[in-house]
Every structure is written in structure tokens, then in C-alpha cells.
């Protein structure tokens, strides 16, 4: 780039100190501007012939040196671009990330617990002996003691800030705080469990600070997670008095519990009688409205008998005609809905006996009776004319009043009259 910036004349080879005047060189190189590369071919031979007049030997040497310099420079630049030099610092990114993850997880697990009492609040937080120290790269040299103390102070400050952050997120507004941010959930209706509520919370909070698993009491869980529903005849072990009404308001205390049960259903109240769960009440599979529809057992029909209430709702059957004798049990005294078992079943569709025409409904009486002891009425007789030829009812215009056939004389099928 610097060479191109220094070229101010019309031809690139003039400022390199060739012998002779510039005009002579311009005239000599004038024909070489059109794509000449000065290689050992016919173009190079023609260039040598052009330069033979004015100091051809010196110009050829200078041109050859210039071309070799350009070639070597371009090759060096190409090699430098293709093959970069080795980096002075080698970084194993996988190992570095693993160390960073281990360091962060160690800081999260070794969060200093909160003091259990106000008197112990002034005690300084100590790092546990098993806690991992600040991870340093393996290839680095040992840092001085001053830098090590500064790094330890920064790590402790960071761990304290992280612990304060997560303890504030774990805080529940309605619960009582204990050591380590854990809350002691005390249930008033649990008898012996309520007496040791504070002791259980303190025991749960006294978890080793080096452990990374957060106890259940320290998590943001509803108090109903730690209670069991009471059953009839099974209690004592959990401390729940069996056979007594335990209200949801006694089991759940706090604003978050009220909101939780308001989301479930409006009937679950915390202080009213609608939220009382009675363990002694059995679950009724039928609602209250279904008990009204159920009648006494003696009025219900047998398994193979027709119900009394749906007599006119069933489809008519050929054996349900009035001529069929009644073979059912004697009915029970009492009228339900104005229909008794003494009254014969009214058919929804009229049969051949009730139809006015009598010719359109012989189909219902053509079935084979299901009960052999039930006599069926005789089927309606339909008159048919089986005489040869056309009947008089179908073609009345072909017959005279005296019964003489008016068709062609030689036509077959004429009436024998």
C-alpha cells in the first residue's frame, strides 16, 4: 500500500531509479500497459526487443529484481495470512468453565445462616472448614498472601449478598421466621404437633451449612403440604383427633392460605361454617334431588315387568293388544300419576283394530307372537281379483256396461263373456 501511495507518475516502474530519461522509459513501456506480467514468454521477449535500444541490459536486470521482490513479498503476505502464529496464552475453556461452576455452587451452598437469637446477631459469620476456596487456574503461580486474603474477603462478601438475596426471596409474609430463613409451621388443631412446633422449626433449621439441599420447611410451600387429612378411626400417629370436625381455617393460617383457597372455590372459607370438613359424614353418591325421585321399594317394578309410569312411552308391540290376557302380579294399592297396573297399556300408534280404513295397517298383526298363550286377532282380509286378463277396476274404459270386451277382435286376453 505504501508503494502504491508513492507512485505519482503515469507508469508504476519509473520512480525506482532506472537509467535514462523518463520520456524514453514511458515510450519504452507504453506498449506494456495492456496486461503485461513480464514473465518468460513471448511478451517478455517482445519487451526485451523494445528495451534493446536504450540501455536494455540494466533495465532488464532492474525489472527482474523488481518482479522477484514483488513475488516474494506477495508470497510472504499470503503465508502470513494463511498460517497465523501461535498464541502466547493457552486457555482451556472447558476446564475454566468447570471451575467457575464449582466455585459458584460452593458459594451458593455455603451461605452463612442467620443468627437464631438477637444476642447472637453480633457474632461474625465464619466460613465452614469444608467449604471450597476461591478457584484459581492450575497453570498460574501461587498468589501472595495479601491477594489471597483480598480474594477471600471478596468471596465472603459475595456469598453474604447472595444469601441475603435468596433469604429475602424465601421469606413468607404470614409465617414466623427462624434460623436459616426457615419457618416453623404450627397447626393449632394438631394437638401434640403444635406443642413442638418451635422445636421442629429449630431442628430443621439446624442443618449443616455445607449441605446444598434446601430442607422442605425452608422452601416456599403452603402449610397444607405438611398436614394429613383425618380419617374415621385412624388418628393418634399424626396427632389429629379422629371423628371431630376439623375446619380449614384451623389448618391454614395466614394471608397466603386464604388466597389459595379463594382460588380453589368460594365455598372453602377460613373462618365460616361452610369450610368445615366433617370426617364422619359419608359421601352420598346421589345428590339431594335424586332422593326425592326415588320411591318406596314395594312400588318399584320387578326386573322383567313393565314400569307403570312409562306405559304410553314405549313402542307398541303386537302382543300388547287389549285381547291379550293379563298375566302380571296383582297391583299394589295406590295411584301414582293417575296410571295404575289395572289399566291396560295404551298404545302409542293405533293397530289394525283401531284404524278407520282397515287396509293400511295389517303389518303389525303379521308378526309371530312372542308369547304363545296370547291369542292374536284374525288378520284383515283383502279382496283380490285373480281372473285372467285385466280387471275391471283397473281399466274400466275397455268394458261396456253389458260386459262385452271392446278391444281388438283377435287380441288375446279378451274377457270370456
UniProtKB/Swiss-Prot annotation:
Residues 104-147 are annotated as: Disordered. It comes from the Eukaryota. InterPro entries: FAM181, TEADIR3_omega_loop. It holds the Pfam family TEADIR3. Coiled coil: none annotated. Belongs to the FAM181 family. PANTHER family: PROTEIN FAM181B. This is Protein FAM181B. It comes from Mus musculus (Mouse). The lineage of its organism: Eukaryota, Metazoa, Chordata, Craniata, Vertebrata. The gene is Fam181b.
Amino acid at each position: 500500500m505504501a508503494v502504491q501511495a508513492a507512485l505519482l507518475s503515469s507508469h508504476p516502474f519509473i520512480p525506482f531509479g532506472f537509467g535514462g530519461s523518463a520520456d524514453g522509459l514511458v515510450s519504452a513501456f507504453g506498449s506494456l500497459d495492456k496486461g503485461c506480467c513480464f514473465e518468460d514468454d513471448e511478451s517478455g521477449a517482445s519487451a526485451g526487443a523494445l528495451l534493446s535500444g536504450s540501455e536494455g541490459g540494466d533495465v532488464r536486470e532492474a525489472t527482474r529484481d523488481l518482479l522477484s521482490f514483488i513475488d516474494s513479498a506477495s508470497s510472504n503476505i499470503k503465508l502470513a495470512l494463511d498460517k497465523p502464529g501461535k498464541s502466547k496464552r493457552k486457555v482451556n475453556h472447558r476446564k475454566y468453565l468447570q471451575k467457575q461452576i464449582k466455585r459458584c455452587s460452593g458459594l451458593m451452598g455455603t451461605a452463612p445462616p442467620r443468627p437464631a437469637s438477637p444476642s447472637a446477631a453480633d457474632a461474625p459469620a465464619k466460613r465452614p472448614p469444608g467449604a471450597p476456596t476461591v478457584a484459581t487456574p492450575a497453570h498460574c503461580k501461587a498468589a501472595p498472601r495479601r491477594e489471597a486474603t483480598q480474594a477471600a474477603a471478596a468471596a465472603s462478601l459475595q456469598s453474604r449478598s447472595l444469601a441475603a438475596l435468596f433469604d429475602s426471596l424465601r421469606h413468607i409474609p404470614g409465617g414466623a421466621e427462624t434460623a436459616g430463613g426457615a419457618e416453623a409451621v404450627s397447626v393449632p388443631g394438631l394437638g401434640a404437633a403444635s406443642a413442638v412446633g418451635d422445636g421442629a422449626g429449630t431442628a430443621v433449621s439446624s442443618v449443616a451449612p455445607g449441605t446444598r439441599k434446601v430442607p422442605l420447611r425452608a422452601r416456599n410451600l403452603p402449610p397444607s403440604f405438611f398436614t394429613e387429612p383425618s380419617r374415621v378411626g385412624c388418628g393418634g400417629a399424626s396427632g389429629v383427633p379422629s371423628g371431630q370436625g376439623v375446619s380449614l381455617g384451623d389448618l391454614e393460617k395466614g394471608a397466603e392460605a386464604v388466597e389459595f383457597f379463594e382460588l380453589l372455590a368460594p365455598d372453602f372459607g377460613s373462618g365460616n361454617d361452610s369450610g368445615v370438613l366433617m370426617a364422619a359424614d359419608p359421601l352420598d353418591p346421589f345428590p339431594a334431588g335424586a332422593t326425592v325421585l326415588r320411591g318406596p321399594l314395594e312400588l318399584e317394578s320387578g326386573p322383567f315387568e313393565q314400569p307403570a309410569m312409562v306405559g304410553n312411552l314405549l313402542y307398541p308391540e303386537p302382543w300388547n293388544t287389549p285381547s291379550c290376557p293379563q298375566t302380571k302380579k296383582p297391583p299394589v294399592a295406590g295411584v301414582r300419576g293417575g296410571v295404575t297396573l289395572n289399566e291396560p297399556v295404551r298404545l302409542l300408534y293405533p293397530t289394525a283394530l283401531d284404524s278407520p280404513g282397515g287396509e293400511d295397517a295389517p303389518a303389525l298383526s303379521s308378526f309371530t307372537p312372542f308369547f304363545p298363550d296370547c291369542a292374536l286377532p284374525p288378520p284383515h282380509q283383502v279382496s283380490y281379483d285373480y281372473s285372467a286378463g285385466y280387471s275391471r277396476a283397473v281399466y274400466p274404459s275397455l268394458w261396456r256396461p253389458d260386459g262385452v270386451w271392446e278391444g281388438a277382435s283377435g287380441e288375446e286376453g279378451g274377457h270370456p263373456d
